[in-house]
């Protein structure tokens, strides 16, 4: 079936005059212009190995968690759970792990545990078993 041209024009005017609800932003124009968090959307990030996909996604997840109190379930089959936790800790503190005091690690990891759940990758799970 073909798109109804009248409806298409109406949608374009809705976009032009900001009548379409926007996803959550980070208040960074250079990011928000291209990427917003939309609840219920399913996004996939693909690319060659060792190009920074996981790092970028974790950074964005941390930024959205800090700004909007979002919570995440992370499955990353190519990365260990402790390497994910380390990146999250370093992103949250802005400090390499070797320079973070133990007491701060304890506090920050409580917050991280509240906002990020990591799926162990030592075996495969069904969607039902994760719920």
Q: What are these model-derived regions, one by one?
A:
Residues 43-46, 73:
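Short hydrophobic/aromatic beta-strand immediately N-terminal to the Walker A/P-loop
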Residues 49:
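The conserved Walker
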Residues 32, 67-131:
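Cytosolic-facing regulatory segments adjacent to core modules
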Residues 56-60:
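Hydrophobic positions on the alpha1 helix immediately C-terminal to the Walker A/P-loop
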Residues 1-39, 110-113:
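Core recognition of P-loop NTPase motor domains used across DNA-transaction enzymes
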Residues 52-53:
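Conserved glycine(s) of the Walker
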Residues 13-20, 41-44, 86-90, 94:
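Short, mixed-charge, low-aromatic patches
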């Amino acid at each position: 079936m073909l798109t109804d041209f009248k409806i298409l024009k109406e949608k374009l005017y809705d976009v032009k005059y900001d009548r379409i609800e926007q996803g959550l932003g980070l208040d960074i124009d250079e990011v928000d212009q291209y990427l917003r968090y939309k609840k219920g959307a399913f996004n996939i990030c693909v690319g060659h190995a060792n190009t920074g996909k996981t790092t970028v996604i974790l950074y964005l997840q941390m930024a959205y968690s800090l700004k909007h109190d979002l919570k995440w379930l992370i499955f990353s089959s190519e990365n260990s759970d402790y390497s994910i936790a380390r990146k999250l800790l370093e992103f949250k503190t802005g400090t390499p792990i070797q320079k973070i005091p133990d007491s701060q690690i304890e506090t920050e990891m409580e917050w991280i545990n509240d906002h990020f759940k990591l799926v162990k990758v030592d075996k495969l799970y069904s969607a039902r078993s994760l719920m």
